[in-house]
Amino acid sequence: MTLPAARTGVLARKVGMTRIFAADGRHVPVTVLSLDGCQVVGVRSEEERSVTTKKGGQVTRTDGYKAVIMGSGDKKAKNTTKALRGQFAKAGVAPKAKLKEFRVSGDLPEVGSTVQADHFAEGQLVDVSAMSIGKGFAGAMKRWNFSGLRASHGVSISHRAHGSTGMNQDPGRVFKNKKMAGHLGDERVTTQNLVVVRTDVERGLILVKGSVPGHDGTFVEVRDAVKKALPADAPAAGSFKAPEKLSAGGEG
C-alpha cells in the first residue's frame, strides 16, 4: 500500500464565528479563517547543497528531511530581527508575523509563492491547531467538569471542592496528573476532522464547520486530516500563486 504524499499545511488567522445557510435551508455554524497573505518563506530538502562558511570555505550540507516554512501576517521591518530580515529578503517576501514549518513528502513549492484558499477542497476534513484561550486558575468543576458535592444534607463550605485526592498508607502520596484545581487553557490544542464548508479564493478565506481553538485574531495551523483520507477532488499539490519579487523599498 502506497500512502499519498503529505501536503503542506497553511497558517491562517482566526477571524471569528458566524453562520451560513446550506442549499436546503439549514444553518451551519462556521469559523472564518483568513490566510492573510500566507507565503512560502523557505523549504527544507534532502538534497545536498554547497554552503559557504564564515572563513570562506565550501562545505556540503543537507537538511535531511523535506519541509515547507510558511509565513503569514504582516510585520514591520523595524520590529524584525536582523537574521529574520535576511531570510525574508533571500526569499523575496515581506516580513511575516508568524512562521511555521510543515513536514511534507511530495514536491516542494517555489519559495515566495502564495498559497490560495482552494488549497483545501470543499467537503474535505482538516485538523486545526492553536493555543487555547487562557482562563487562569480554575477549580475542579470548571477545569475537569466535576459535578461537585451536594447543596445540603451535611455539606458545608465544600460544595465545589474536588474531594479526596490521596490514597491509603500505601502508596501514601498523590499520583502525578491527578485531576485537581490549577491553570486552565493557554495550551496547544488540536481539533480534528473539521469539515471545510466553503472557500473564497479572492478574499483568501476558509470556512470550517464548528469552532477552533484560540481567541479571535490568533494564528492557527490548518492541515489535511491525519485520520481521514483526502477526497478525490482535493488539489494534488496545493494551489499556489507564483511569487512576486519585492521592489527595492518593499520591506518598509
Swiss-Prot record:
GO terms for molecular function: rRNA binding; structural constituent of ribosome. InterPro entries: Ribosomal_uL3 (IPR000597), Ribosomal_uL3_bac/org-type (IPR019927), Ribosomal_uL3_CS (IPR019926), Transl_B-barrel_sf (IPR009000). Keywords: Methylation, Ribonucleoprotein, Ribosomal protein, RNA-binding, rRNA-binding. The keyword Protein transport does not apply. Methylated by PrmB. The modification N5-methylglutamine is found at residue 169. GO terms for cellular component: cytosolic large ribosomal subunit. It comes from the Bacteria. The keyword Ribonucleoprotein applies. GO terms for biological process: translation. It holds the Pfam family Ribosomal_L3. SUPFAM superfamilies: Translation proteins. One of the primary rRNA binding proteins, it binds directly near the 3'-end of the 23S rRNA, where it nucleates assembly of the 50S subunit. PANTHER family: 50S RIBOSOMAL PROTEIN L3, LARGE RIBOSOMAL SUBUNIT PROTEIN UL3C. Part of the 50S ribosomal subunit. Forms a cluster with proteins L14 and L19. Belongs to the universal ribosomal protein uL3 family. This is Large ribosomal subunit protein uL3. It comes from Hyphomonas neptunium (strain ATCC 15444).
